[in-house]
Amino acid sequence: KLADKVDKSAPFLDFKHVSLTYQGAGAPTLQDMNFTVNRGDTVGIIGGTGSGKTSLVNLIPGFYPATEGEILLEGRDIRTMSDEELRGRIGVVPQKAVLFKGTIRSNLQWGKPDATEEEMWKALELAQASEVVDGKPGKLDATVAQNGKNFSGGQRQRLTIARALVRNPEILILDDSASALDYATDAKLRAAIRTLEDKTTTFIVSQRASTIRHADKIIVLDDGEIAGMGNHDELLKDCTVYQEIYYSQYPEQRGGVR
């Protein structure tokens, strides 16, 4: 049983000196990722294009094996878990929102085949997508065209997030998944996700400092290495890379009130 193998004293997730080199690549994509995450934390991951943000979160569900080091989930090396066991605990929302031809209901069932209507509506509400579905003829049974072409980019992203949330995952990974949302919807989505924090550990990859500034821990990546780690205020004080990102987005706040 899984419960027998869980180390209650261990951090929920523990990256121990993890490096990743893709097959055929000369240089490592990630080098010496070393950090712990508590259950229920929200972790923001920020950095420039090509800094390794997506590669880092793709290690958690085991999409790629670490080249060096180990990743422990409640004290267990994730390499000792089957894909089904590991990925059954994780909801991933990739950068590109993907919807399948069918209905809204059938798309949500990809996340959880036996989901009840109540669970579906709860997930839609958290993902700020309930109004979208409510406004469609047939509601949950409304048609979804191939690739969700009959929905806007922001609507597709919200429905994809709902599909990840319907399974009530222990770990939720949002990989730049709110980039097509306006700031108000993005803020509402983040507030809703914070209500899950008791049991859901959330990783948010974003180019926007505003999206991750309230995270419990922010990991700043630069060229595959950790350039800084801490909360928003700590990083704004001590991390040059974070300062550059933040002030490039909020130039009026340089030297002023944050």
Residue ranges and their predicted role:
Residues 4-258:
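ABC-type nucleotide-binding domain
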